[in-house]
Amino acid sequence: MTQQKSILKKLFGIPSIEEGVFNTSIRGVEGMGGNLVQKTSGDRVIWAIVVILSLISLLVVYSSTGSLAYKYSKSTESYLFKQFALIISGVIFIYFAHRVNYTFYSRVAKILFLISIPLLIYTYFFGTTLNEGSRWIKLPVINQTFQTSDLAKLALFMYLSRQLSRKQMVIKDFKKGFLPIIIPILVICVLIAPANLSTAMLVAGTSFMLMFIGRVNTKHILLTISIALIPIIILLMVAVKYYDKVEGKSKDLPAIFSSGRVPTWISRIQTFIYTGKGDVGEKTYQINQAKIAIASGGWFGRGPGNSNARNFLPHSYSDFIFAIILEEYGLLGGAFIVFIYLLFLYRCIRLYRKCPFAFGAFLALALSFTLVIQAFANMGVNVNVFPNTGVTLPLVSMGGSSFLFTCLSIGIILSVARNVEQQESPAALVIDKEEI
C-alpha cells in the first residue's frame, strides 16, 4: 500500500493521507495539475500543434453542424460538447501513450498485427455497412462503433517499423529482407481495400515510402508498385470505357465490376474525370457546394460562424470540413492549416534524424507520413484535385474512433520524442524506475 501511494505521488503529485490530504486538498489538486504539465514532455511544437488543431476543430465543428442538428432535432451545442469531450479523451490518450516507453510498442506490435487480421475479416462479413462497405464494428459493452482499419493501420506501422529495424543486415535480400516486410503490408491492404480502397491506398503509399527510407531494395519496391497499379489502371480504363459522354452518365457495367463497392469507385472516377464547371447533378452536388464555399471565402473569409455552404454541403463537419474552413477563414486560413501539417511533418522528420534507435525513428516517420498524407488527401478532395475518398482531416474533422486513434498515433510519436529528449539531456531528466 505504501509503495502504491509512493507511485501515485511521484506520477501525479497526489499527496498521501498521512501527509494530510484532507487538510491540503486544494494544494493537492494544484500539485497534481503542475506535475501533469511538468510530466508532459517530448516535442513542445507537436504539443502546440495538437492544441491549435483542436481549437480549430471546436470552432469549425460548432459552425458546421447546424444542418446535422436540425436533421436529428438536436442543438449545435450538443455536438460542440461531444467534440470537446472527444478532444479531452484524445489528449488523455496522447498523455498516457507518450508516457509509455516507445520500446513497449515494439513488443506488442506483432500481437496487435495478428489481432487486427481477424478483426478486419469479421468487419468485412459482419460489420456495420455504409455505402455498401463494411467499415465498423460495434463494441457490445459500451455500444460504440469503431473503424477496424484504424487499428490495423497502427498495428501494421508498428510491426513494419519493427521489421525494418531488425532486418537491416539482410534488407537487400529478397527472401530474408523483402518478403517478411511486404507480406504484412499486402495482407492488411487486401483486407481493407474491399470496404475502404482509399485507406488501403494510403497505407500502401506510406508503407512504400517507409520501405524506401528503410533501404529496402529499390527494384523490389518498384516491382511491387507496378503490380499494385494494375487494378488501379483497370479501374481507370473501365471508368473511361463505360461512360457515355453524350448523355453524361455511366453505362451498364459488366457483372465482374458490379459487385461490392467497385461501382462506387468507378462512379467517383467518372465524376472526377468528366464533370466540368457547369455540370449540375446528384453526383456533382457535393463538390459543387464545396467550390461555392471556397469561392465565397476569398482571401480573408466570411468570418467564424458565417458559413452559408454548411446548410447545403453534405458532411461539412467531416469529409468536407476544409471547404468550411476556406469559406469562413479564407485562403489565408486554409494556408495556415497547410502550414500546420507541414510543420508537424518537419518536426517528425527532425525527430527521425535525431532518434538514435531505428525502431523509434521508423515508427515516428510512418505515423507522421500517414497523418499528413491523409490530411492532404482530404484537402485535395475539398478543392477537387482528387476524387472523393471519404477520409477525414486529422484532429479537425468531427469523429469518433478515428480521432482517438489519431491521438494515440501522436502520443506514440511524442513517446519517441520524449526518449530523444532524455538521450540528449540525461542530467536534466531523471528516469524513474517505476515509470510506466
Language-model features: locations:
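Membrane-helix boundary/helix-loop-helix interface segments in multi-pass membrane proteins
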Residues: 2-48, 52-53, 59-195, 379-392, ...
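Hydrophobic alpha-helical transmembrane segments
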Residues: 85-93, 328-345
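Transmembrane alpha-helix boundary/anchor motif
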Residues: 92, 100, 159, 264, ...
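Hydrophobic alpha-helical segments of polytopic membrane proteins
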Residues: 110-111, 117, 177-190, 197-257
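Hydrophobic, glycine- and aromatic-enriched re-entrant/interface helices and adjoining loop segments
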Residues: 130, 134-136, 225-331, 359
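Alpha-helical transmembrane segments of multi-pass membrane proteins, especially transporters
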Residues: 176, 180, 224, 362-370
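Interfacial segments of multi-pass membrane proteins
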Residues: 207-220, 307-333, 391-404
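Loop-to-helix entry and N-terminal half of a specific, functionally important transmembrane alpha helix
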Residues: 349-390, 396
